[in-house]
């Protein structure tokens, strides 16, 4: 009888541990979603100049008279199996104090070398934004690059995350020492954002991507660290296809 009671007690304790662990996991997932939701709920921002009037997270890193600078990034990285990786993207710095924007479009070929050594061949093309139009600030002879800049749209302009709660059963990771955190979800090709990416990029795979929300810093908010979203279509040795995006507010250099 005593053995039976001990067995029942052991089983109950096991279920309790599992329940607590699952509860903590779900709680942390909700925290991660809430942390990203503050920014992603603004998507889509069709007119990027609207960001001049949008507030972001502020802490003691900001001077009291500094409205901050929004940093907008989007890039697509494609490495066919066994070949070099091609990366194309853009970064904009939108100063809310001066209401001016500058940045650059970049093209990078990361070559695979013997012994696993990589060599970058990044080229940057400075740009500015006027009346929601991105304009090169220097003469560009390559007509293809000029057209790519002219037609470029940030994911923040067409992506939509109105309801993050629809993403469920994610793979959650949290390291309080860094701190760092991430939530990964398997998507389908019917997902709205996946359709938008395929519409704009020649993605050489039919595989549906995983959505990765990853960041560092205080989950409740911090101007130190980062918050990125990534759509990972392929991730393995010698072959990678992924799209990266971020939008965050930082202290302005001009203050």
From Swiss-Prot:
It is found in: Cell membrane. Its main location: membrane. Residues 1-23 form the signal peptide. Transmembrane segments: none annotated. It is a lipid-anchor. It comes from the Bacteria. Belongs to the staphylococcal tandem lipoprotein family. This is Uncharacterized lipoprotein SAR0106.
